[in-house]
Regions:
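Short glycine/proline- and aromatic-enriched beta-strand/turn motifs that initiate or cap beta-hairpins
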Residues: 22-77, 237
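Short loop/turn motifs that connect adjacent beta-strands in outer-membrane beta-barrel proteins
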Residues: 24-28, 53-63, 98-104, 141-146, ...
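Short, well-ordered amphipathic alpha-helices
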Residues: 46-52, 91, 163-169
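Bacterial N-terminal signal peptides that target proteins for export
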Residues: 2-11
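Hydrophobic secondary-structure block in the mid-to-C-terminal portion of proteins
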Residues: 167-207
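Outer-membrane beta-barrel "beta-signal"
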Residues: 42, 47, 205, 225-238
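Outer-membrane pore/translocation modules
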Residues: 37-40, 63-163, 184-195, 216-218, ...
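Bacterial N-terminal signal peptides
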Residues: 11-21
């Protein structure tokens, strides 16, 4: 039942963005999705859609973004492991500034969150939260590779997330498929109750308008210490 409003908000957000596209303005948007899991079965799955609200003027362009995600994780309470799940949806308004090959983005919006948590005794708890979400990004695209930095903060639980990604072109194909990029991620996340750090290589393959990314690496978390993670991402403009 807790997932029902989550799905409803995602559908509403997608419909809103599609209505923006259909009303107007032949403006390019972006869609991105992915799934990541670690060796303990903790996962993160997400879907995001971003669309501009008007044409770029003097490098500035406002946009709207809807981002939804589901997270499954394990925590320890008095030495006992317990499982929890949360889902959230964040509709945001943002501003993008482009200068040459660099783009800088900032966005803010409400975050709607639903959490289900195992209890020591009795049924799972179900809680709903509403808070504020802020995100900043810096992105540089070049044929030889990309640089992408992202930082976000949610005030519901004081959770911060940051990631830096760099890729390099290692094989260029003159056909529609397939050039190859290799690179790496360095990410950190946490609040006053939890923290984790991840680092690892990635491979990115453009296929027509799609960008497929495979990634994996080492993870250190407060809960389980050393571990490993792997994931897949898909990005495409529309």
């Amino acid at each position: 039942m807790a997932g029902t409003p989550y799905v409803r908000y995602v559908i509403a957000g997608v419909a809103l963005l599609l209505s923006v596209k259909c009303e107007g303005l032949a403006l390019a948007g972006d869609a991105f999705t992915g799934y990541q899991v670690d060796n303990k079965g903790e996962y993160f799955a997400y879907l995001g859609i971003r669309a501009p609200l008007m044409e770029e003027r003097k490098g500035f362009q406002p946009f709207i973004q809807v981002f939804g995600a589901g997270v499954g994780y394990t925590f320890k309470d008095n030495g006992q492991e317990r499982d929890a799940n949360l889902q959230y949806v964040t509709p945001s308004l943002g501003l993008k500034y482009t200068a040459g090959s660099w783009s800088f983005l900032g966005m803010v919006g409400p975050q709607f969150r639903w959490k289900q948590e195992d209890q020591a005794t009795g049924p799972r708890s179900n809680e709903n939260f509403v808070g504020t979400y802020v995100q900043l990004e810096a992105f540089r695209w070049h044929e030889e590779g990309i640089f992408h930095a992202i930082a976000s903060y949610a005030d519901i639980d004081g959770f911060s997330y940051g990631r830096v990604r760099k890729t390099w072109l290692v094989h260029k194909s003159e056909q529609s498929c397939c050039s190859w990029y290799v690179g790496g991620d360095l990410a950190g996340m946490g609040n006053n109750q939890f923290y984790a750090v991840q680092a690892g290589p990635l491979v990115q393959v453009p296929i027509n308008i799609f960008y497929l990314t495979l990634k994996g690496g080492y993870q250190y978390s407060q809960t389980f210490h050393s571990g490993a993670y792997g994931g897949v991402e898909l990005y495409f403009p529309f």
